């Protein structure tokens, strides 16, 4: 069970809304989000309703203003509780439709270019666990939640291009 609290103002002030499950539309509960407290679980937040737009991965902790979660604005319109699993495994492909060179991964990877000599990933197959793909090395840039399924093209995980810099397993460390 997860628990996240959204606050309209910085520093955990103003109107707040507590959530414990996926919510495709948070607009009815608050108009802006400037701080967040994650009491339990790992969460993916989305800039727009129905799990669209920029994505922000948060684990347990306090985020006193939106820059703390690398937000571009105070707009959070949907959220998803990420299920915890024990093992993680995925396959990266250099070409669409799971073609070309394939690399398998079961641990975090801070730099895909250094490890696999790839700057772009055109398709993925997440076999176990949930992952966050970052467009830049060292877990920076745009973030994309990857759940167990096949992603035949980078559009399938919500990206605008095939840039892939780093990958991190979703693990609740507490």
Curated annotation (Swiss-Prot):
SMART domains: XTALbg. Residues 84-87 are annotated as: Connecting peptide. The modification S-methylcysteine is found at residue 23. SUPFAM superfamilies: gamma-Crystallin-like (SSF49695). Coiled coil: none annotated. Transmembrane segments: none annotated. Keywords: Eye lens protein, Methylation, Repeat. The keyword Repeat applies. GO terms for molecular function: structural constituent of eye lens. GO terms for cellular component: cytoplasm; nucleus. Residues 2-40, 41-83, 88-128, 129-171 form the Beta/gamma crystallin 'Greek key' domain. The keyword Repeat applies. InterPro entries: Beta/Gamma-Crystallin (IPR050252), Beta/gamma_crystallin (IPR001064), G_crystallin-like (IPR011024). It comes from the Eukaryota. GO terms for biological process: camera-type eye development; eye development; lens development in camera-type eye; visual perception. Belongs to the beta/gamma-crystallin family. There are six different gamma crystallins identified in rat lens. PANTHER family: BETA/GAMMA CRYSTALLIN, GAMMA-CRYSTALLIN C. Has a two-domain beta-structure, folded into four very similar Greek key motifs. Crystallins are the dominant structural components of the vertebrate eye lens. This is Gamma-crystallin C. It comes from Rattus norvegicus (Rat).
């Amino acid at each position: 069970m997860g628990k996240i609290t959204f606050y309209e103002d910085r520093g955990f002030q103003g109107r707040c809304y507590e959530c414990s499950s996926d919510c495709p539309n948070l607009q009815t509960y608050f108009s802006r989000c400037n701080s967040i407290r994650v009491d339990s679980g790992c969460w993916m937040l989305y800039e727009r309703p129905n799990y669209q737009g920029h994505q922000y991965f948060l684990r347990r902790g306090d985020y006193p203003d939106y820059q703390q979660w690398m937000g571009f604005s105070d707009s959070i319109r949907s959220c998803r509780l990420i299920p915890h699993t024990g093992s993680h495994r995925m396959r990266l492909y250099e070409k669409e439709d799971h073609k070309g060179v394939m690399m398998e991964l079961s641990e975090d990877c801070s730099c895909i270019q250094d490890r696999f000599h790839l700057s772009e990933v055109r398709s993925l197959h997440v076999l176990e666990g949930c992952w966050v793909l970052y467009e830049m090395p060292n877990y920076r840039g745009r973030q994309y939640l990857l759940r167990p399924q096949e992603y035949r093209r980078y559009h399938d995980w919500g990206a605008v291009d095939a840039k892939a810099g780093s990958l991190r397993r979703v693990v609740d460390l507490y």
